[in-house]
UniProtKB/Swiss-Prot annotation:
Pfam families: CtaG_Cox11. GO terms for cellular component: plasma membrane. Belongs to the COX11/CtaG family. This is Cytochrome c oxidase assembly protein CtaG. Residues 1-9 are cytoplasmic. It comes from the Bacteria. Residues 31-192 are periplasmic. NCBIfam families: PRK05089.1 (NF003465). The chain crosses the membrane at residues 10-30. The lineage of its organism: Bacteria, Pseudomonadati, Pseudomonadota, Alphaproteobacteria, Rhodobacterales. Exerts its effect at some terminal stage of cytochrome c oxidase synthesis, probably by being involved in the insertion of the copper B into subunit I. The keyword Cell wall biogenesis/degradation does not apply. Keywords: Cell inner membrane, Cell membrane, Copper, Membrane, Signal-anchor, Transmembrane, Transmembrane helix. InterPro entries: CtaG/Cox11_dom_sf, Cyt_c_oxidase_assmbl_CtaG.
Length: 192
């Protein structure tokens, strides 16, 4: 069975569309992984504890918050900036509020600028490590514990950094299965 030139072209085009779709689907997780591994684009490090060394030099940390289009939450930092000593653990809070009449889940992506500081800004604990689920009308304060690695003062570019901006963007995600089941259940019905 021989295919006509039109059928071959159509088959080739379908293959191109499938490959492009797969590549676009894989691009976001691949880019996220790449940035976390290399610190590219200001991606921060994750640490289990702060370093033992705390320097006298301070650095100003600014906090920024945004939402992707369609994310219904209100989201903001509870402080605009703070001054921390390099190596000292800082603790900041963000607030999220779900003004809708439905349960909404979200995850936060993050970035640090300038890019030279990304590899030296380490988070010990962060709301961005897990998915957040807010019930209708729920308001929460979410902490982020961090430090600036003292090695920044020895970095060719990092030693000139005097201010770091930590930015978060909240993205709406699918509700976890158990939350979706609860949200779909009519009010007043008890499953027990």
């Amino acid at each position: 069975m021989s295919l006509s030139p039109h059928q071959k072209t159509a088959g080739w085009l379908v293959g191109v569309v499938v490959v492009m779709g797969a590549a676009s689907f894989a691009a976001v997780p691949f880019y996220d992984w790449f940035c976390r591994v290399t610190g590219f684009g200001g991606t921060t490090a994750v640490a289990s504890e702060a370093p033992a060394e705390v320097l006298d030099r301070t650095i100003r940390v600014r906090f920024d918050a945004s939402r992707e289009a369609g994310m219904p939450w209100e989201f903001r930092p509870l402080q605009r900036e703070m001054e921390v000593r390099i190596g000292e653990t800082g603790l900041a809070f963000y607030e999220a509020y779900n003004p809708t009449d439905r349960t909404v889940a979200g995850t936060a992506s993050y970035n640090v600028t300038p890019d030279a500081a990304g590899g030296y800004f380490a988070k010990i604990a962060c709301f961005c490590f897990t998915e957040q689920v807010l019930a209708p009308g729920e308001r929460v304060e979410m902490p982020v514990s961090f430090y600036v690695d003292p090695a920044i003062v020895k970095d060719r570019d990092g030693r000139y950094v005097r201010q770091i901006t930590l930015s978060y963007t909240f993205h709406q995600t699918e509700l976890p299965e158990e939350q979706a089941a609860l949200a779909a259940r009519p009010a007043g019905i008890d499953v027990n």
